Amino acid sequence: MKDVGVLAAMTISVLGPASDVDCFFKSVVFFLENGKRGSKYPSVTEKLYCRSLSESELAELKVDLESIRVEFDGIPADGFDKGAFGVSEGNTRLLLNGNTLADIFSRFFKAILDAVECSDAFHEEFNECVPLRLGFTDAPDYIFDVNRPEDLYNSIASDELPFWLR
């Protein structure tokens, strides 16, 4: 299975197989957005899920991720049916021994927030904006995702799969 991760300025952070990443977004939609993607955290479940985020959108992404982490910290992991969200126990990098959903997805929060920090630092230092997006981290697909024009990412309709799930 190909790995998916965060692609940003000076950053390639592997999150895990596509099923893990998809599970994260499905969990946000199911537990926090009442099944309606983008209704509460559009910067995460719409933009990060399938599009590119520009420098001006990173502050909102950071706030939303912190809010999701706080809400996930109140959801016990013992009632979380990972199989229902498409996760295979034999092919996952999720921290399945966590006590809460925040624990299970802690690597995701760290990787994405670190990428936001790197993007901010890169912009300050070089006055250049590199979009933050999700994509494959394995060659050769990584090369295609990094070089894919931003307008292709941003033209994905809400009902279409992101590139990393195709």
Give the location of each predicted region:
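Acidic (Asp/Glu-rich) sequence patches and key acidic residues
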Residues: M1-R166
